[in-house]
Amino acid sequence: MKDLFKIYSNYQPAGDQPTAIASLIDGLESGLAKQTLLGVTGSGKTFTIAHVIQAMKRPTLIMAPNKTLAAQLYGEFKAFFPDNAVEYFVSYYDYYQPEAYVPASDTFIEKDASINEHIEQMRLSATKALIERKDAIIVATVSAIYGLGDPDSYLRMLLHLSRGEQSDQRKILKRLAEMQYTRTNLSLERGQFRVHGDVIDIFPADSEKEAIRIELFDDEVDNIARFDPLTGEILQRLPRVTIFPKTHYVTPRERILETVEKVKVELQERLAELNAQNKLVEAQRLEQRTCFDIEMMLELGYCSGIENYSRYLSNREAGEAPPTLFDYLPPEALLIIDESHVTVPQIGGMYRGDRARKETLVNYGFRLPSALDNRPLRFEEFEERSPQTIYISATPGPYEQEHSDNVAEQVVRPTGLIDPEVEIRPVKTQVDDLMSEIRQVIAQGSRILVTTLTKRMAEDLTEYLSEHGIKVRYLHSDVDTVERMEIIRDLRLGEFDVLVGINLLREGLDMPEVALVAILDADKEGFLRSERSLIQTIGRAARNVKGRAILYADTMTGSMQRALTETERRREKQKAFNLKHGITPKGINKSVEDILEGAYIGKRKTMVAEQAPRYTHWSPQELAKEINALEKQMYAHAQNMEFELAAKIRDEYLLLKEQLMKI
């Protein structure tokens, strides 16, 4: 247990980090249920939590408000803990349209989804790590509170094999089929098995690159090995192996038969209700759909939308909470909720939206009433299942403030950087004054963020600044995550100097180059000008030594007053610490790829100029061969979440395709 978790880092805790770490550890050891880490932007909150995990030696679930932040946290924790099981658990849908019915237009929308195979593998790997290892760190989104396969059924479906044990080949193959693995005679893919004589090759659903080879001699397991399914190279001989099911929703045959009987009983009861209400179309529709599902379950052991029968499959009572990732957590686990001011309300809001959609499906005969139990956890159920919890935020919400038994402040940054100086200026001349400030900041080689209240104003301001010779871009809600990252990358590289937006509070906007944040119409009370939003927005300039914030307002609102008071309190504490310890604030000099996971590297034009000579004299055959090789490398890096490398190779790949088209 001594070195169960080991941090690899060139840095030691500094600033407020040592006291925050000690305070949180003391709270956990004292048995406090809920604590908050109040950490300002750029104070190294992730590093602090990593030290808490290392000290407590307990499996940890970290929840983030969205996939982008979860991916960033996953990358950071994987770098801190390379020897431990750092896993990623988010929704595996690239695209998801839930089934729904619109009574007004009599429109039924079938469930439509595109599943990301790699993320599905990572989800399976996450639950496997929780079952098998004590050193698991799972980074998840709100997907963690949604229904998952019952852990009891899942564990009953494991396939254990040991060298020297008696085991019939047909019995192993039958078990693999029950675990929803499919047989193939071609190349081995994830979730498949292949048979050659007495040799069974299995590519576990939770494995990214390695497959398992079982060699039988008569009815005895003669050899077990890990091998590379691409090259066939044996990597390691094993004394024993455990194969996990292909999906979380596998169920033993006897449970399927029990489920079918219960579904039949509920169907008859529901049909009687609908017929009594003279809802004949709904009754006929429900009978047809349910009977088809029953037939599929009896034949294959599963059906499309099997999760709608999860109440029976997990043997739970009506209204009882569904099994989720929390059911896989050991009792001694830790729960970390990042950006808790966003994540906690998000968790609280999931149940009602899901319920409203499903009630319509039940009322109009598309689903049985038991489908209502295939749902996310209600907030009170989430609270019941939560182990000891640490909330992380620069601006904790009312829930965290009310329920936390201890608040660890992390206001002093390891770099000595001080919160931005805040000025208030009149609204009447805000655009002209802003123009003057922008020109001064650009002359210093820095960047500017401007936040407006409406889309129209953002567009007009962008156009106005552009007409006056300022390189400006507008970040709006229609921009997807990848394009968003590319816009941020261009701002950091100086392709343009000013970024205008409405809500600049989302992830990925902590840029060291930003020296000025301008908040227009700061005195208009509302979500975008609340105390929490103002503090978060002001903090966008906190990574720059010369960081400033200007609030354009004619009156001092309560939110403004509280935000300014809190910012000033932090500044005083930071300055006092720096003075006491003789620290000179240092700017953060991070290269673009360090901060922007998902954005490609370098200037495209420069890259084209550099790469072109290398390929000038290549034949079409050589170019085509190189294009294929680069494509494979690109997808391999993307699968490993090495987005910067993947994007760099993508640029080269596109350049080569362009070159090939010219020949």
UniProtKB/Swiss-Prot annotation:
Recorded GO MF terms: ATP binding; ATP hydrolysis activity; DNA binding; excinuclease ABC activity
One Gene Ontology term from the biological process aspect of the record: nucleotide-excision repair
PROSITE patterns reported in the protein's UniProt record: HELICASE_ATP_BIND_1 (PS51192), HELICASE_CTER (PS51194), UVR (PS50151)
GO annotation, cellular component aspect: cytoplasm; excinuclease repair complex
Residues of the Helicase C-terminal domain: 430-596
CDD domains named among the record's database cross-references: DEXHc_UvrB, SF2_C_UvrB
Binding annotation for ATP: 39-46
One Pfam family it belongs to: ResIII
Keywords, in A-Z order: ATP-binding, Cytoplasm, DNA damage, DNA excision, DNA repair, Excision nuclease, Nucleotide-binding, SOS response
Domain UVR residue range list: 624-659
UniProt motif Beta-hairpin: location: 92-115
Locations listed in the record: Cytoplasm
InterPro entries: Helicase/UvrB_N, Helicase_ATP-bd, Helicase_C-like, P-loop_NTPase, UVR_dom, UVR_dom_sf, UvrB, UvrB_inter
Domain Helicase ATP-binding per the UniProt entry, residue ranges: 26-414
Function: The UvrABC repair system catalyzes the recognition and processing of DNA lesions. A damage recognition complex composed of 2 UvrA and 2 UvrB subunits scans DNA for abnormalities. Upon binding of the UvrA(2)B(2) complex to a putative damaged site, the DNA wraps around one UvrB monomer. DNA wrap is dependent on ATP binding by UvrB and probably causes local melting of the DNA helix, facilitating insertion of UvrB beta-hairpin between the DNA strands. Then UvrB probes one DNA strand for the presence of a lesion.
Record note on domains: The beta-hairpin motif is involved in DNA binding.
HAMAP family for the chain: UvrB (MF_00204)
Family classification: Belongs to the UvrB family.
Subunit structure: Forms a heterotetramer with UvrA during the search for lesions. Interacts with UvrC in an incision complex.
Protein name: UvrABC system protein B
Organismal lineage: Bacteria, Pseudomonadati, Pseudomonadota, Gammaproteobacteria, Legionellales
Gene behind the chain: uvrB
